[in-house]
Amino acid sequence: MTQDEMKNAAAIKALEFIENDTIVGVGTGSTVNFFIEALASMKDKIAGAVSSSEESTKRLKAHGIEVFDLNSVDVLDVYVDGADEITRHMSMIKGGGAALTREKIVAAVAKKFICIADDSKQVKVLGNFPLPVEVIPMARSYVARELVKLGGDPVYRQGVTTDNGNVILDVYNLEILDPKALETQINAIVGVVTNGLFALRGADILVLGSKDGIQVIQ
């Protein structure tokens, strides 16, 4: 299977975790785009979706899936999203598509977080993929200096503004041995909205597409 075929296979498998008449949390990214296509096949069986980005909202609506504001939803049974990296402990780096804050909010509300990915995303240690940090614009330089103190090499992602009106610093050369501690430490920097470590609230289930087929890891 090609990488896209692995992503698509994982996306289709994730439909098995979607119950009828529920509102589905939907993430953002290339793998999630396959999931949205798959979800459209059962759109008449679900109540609708909550989306983590403007891009996913457009795709969902284009398929005739109703999109709810998260503030109007008390509970989400399932949130389905991809990852840039994920470990066997279900900690992730996310945010390559700059939607990390909304992704983290929707994940916090969901009872179950299902990560869909191809096997290139599974790693032993997080940090080869640069860690995105969403920052209030006026704090960009200050936050960058603080991230250097933590051993990282932050790079301003030019030309990118998040759905929340903020900027992204991509932090290179971090060997993340304690994801929960680093997630907390970076979030404590004044001016940081959040960072792309999903360790305090990691995935509950990983649906992994590989050349050998689909693995479901819990």
From Swiss-Prot:
Q: Which reaction does it catalyse?
A: aldehydo-D-ribose 5-phosphate = D-ribulose 5-phosphate
Q: Which pathway does the protein contribute to?
A: Carbohydrate degradation; pentose phosphate pathway; D-ribose 5-phosphate from D-ribulose 5-phosphate (non-oxidative stage): step 1/1
Residues given in the record as substrate binding sites: T28, G29, S30, T31, D81, G82, A83, D84, K94, G95, G96, G97, K121
| A single GO cellular-component term on record | cytosol
Biological process (GO) annotations held by this record are: D-ribose metabolic process; pentose-phosphate shunt, non-oxidative branch
Keywords on this record? Isomerase
Q: What is its EC number?
A: 5.3.1.6
GO molecular function per UniProt: ribose-5-phosphate isomerase activity
Q: Name one Pfam family in it.
A: Rib_5-P_isom_A
Q: Which domain of life is it from?
A: Bacteria
UniProt entry tagged with the keyword Isomerase: yes
Q: Which InterPro entries match?
A: NagB/RpiA_transferase-like, Ribose5P_isomerase_typA_subgr, Ribose5P_isomerase_type_A
Catalytic residues (positions): E103 (proton acceptor)
PANTHER family per the record? RIBOSE-5-PHOSPHATE ISOMERASE
Assembly, in brief, is: Homodimer.
Query: What is the annotated role of this protein in its UniProt record?
Result: Catalyzes the reversible conversion of ribose-5-phosphate to ribulose 5-phosphate.
Give the family, as the similarity comment puts it: Belongs to the ribose 5-phosphate isomerase family.
| The protein, known as | Ribose-5-phosphate isomerase A
